[in-house]
Amino acid sequence: MKKRQIPQHLKDLIKAVGMSEQEATWDCHGTPVIYHDALERIASHIGIQFEKPDVIKNNVEEGFVAMCVTGTDGDKIEWSIGEASPFNSKNSYPFAMSEKRAKDRVILKLIGASGFVYSE
């Protein structure tokens, strides 16, 4: 399998927030993965704004949460679903994990890196 490359515009954003590629990303079997803190820094740097998350599914007893997050960057608007359950997270804080996943996906869409890089 061919190793995927990090898009140049994402490399530039990583550098703009004072991080190196090695600090901001890791390689998962040839697929670049970016850390959550790097995406948060990038979002803040370029001025991405988030609306209040919309909780779609909430079953605390089973540890399952799904929410929709919408973000804007100027006139660009993107949304994504974040989910957390015992099947995909060992953490005991499903609301925070669901929000983190949704925000990361929205940031990747807004910066044009969705499908090229994945979030942790």
Where are the model-predicted features located?
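Polyanion-binding surfaces on beta-sheet-dominated domains and ring/shell assemblies
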Residues: 1-120
